[in-house]
Design a protein with these regions (language model features):
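N-terminal secretory targeting signals
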Residues: 1-47
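A short, glycine/acidic-enriched catalytic loop
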Residues: 67-82, 148-178
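Conserved acidic residues
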Residues: 139-140
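Generic non-transmembrane alpha-helical segments
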Residues: 97, 101, 173-182
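Solvent-exposed loop/turn segments at secondary-structure junctions
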Residues: 57-60, 115-119, 147-153, 165-166, ...
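Active-site histidine-acidic residue metal-binding/catalytic motifs
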Residues: 32-131
Length: 182
């Protein structure tokens, strides 16, 4: 699987379709981030690198930073699931699906869900931040899924590059598929 991913990273998108240009609208994911990408992912990773997938805002429900409500809720509809933002709902659904499909395709990938929906201290054990930090420090690759590119305050879809490691070929491929942030 990693060799296949590397081949895809070298030739373009996994779908064989040209990537959506920055600022353009993808029919599935919406607008791509128009921000200029100022990095290149060149670091090669082990073919069996452990990948941790997390749902954005999974540990911040009911407090500042809980994710966007979404267009339907802003227009008066009820949230998709009581007690969580619509963004968090989709983050959970997609992060779990990514891990499940990745496992079916032979990737060393797992989904992480915090023990609580509200953890005020972002550095506390069990938060996405602390789990992702520890996972990458141990040599793994961590990815947090977000769907907050909605409305006038949204920037658009894209990969926010890692803060603590050199940019990798996985980062580069994800940026080609979904857009990139500087």
């Amino acid at each position: 699987p990693a060799a296949e991913a590397q081949q895809l990273a070298n030739r373009g998108t996994s779908s064989g379709v040209a990537p959506v240009a920055p600022g353009a609208v993808d029919p599935l994911l919406g607008v791509r981030s128009p921000l200029p990408k100022d990095w290149i992912g060149l670091r090669q990773l082990a073919p069996n690198i452990p990948i941790l997938v997390m749902a954005g805002h999974a540990d911040s429900q009911g407090i500042s930073g809980s994710g966007t409500s979404g267009a339907a809720v802003a227009a008066g509809a009820a949230p998709m699931y009581p007690g969580i933002t619509d963004e968090h709902y989709w983050n959970l659904v997609i992060a779990h699906a990514v891990a499940t499909l990745g496992q079916q395709r032979g990737l060393n990938i797992r989904f992480y869900k915090p023990p609580l929906r509200t953890i005020v201290d972002g550095d506390a054990p069990g938060t996405n931040w602390s789990m992702g930090r520890d996972h990458t420090a141990a040599g793994g690759y961590a990815l947090e899924i977000h769907f907050d590119a909605w409305g006038p305050s949204g920037v658009g879809s894209g990969l926010i590059p890692p803060l603590h490691t050199a940019f990798s070929t996985i980062d580069e491929q994800l940026a080609r598929e979904f857009g990139a942030y500087p």
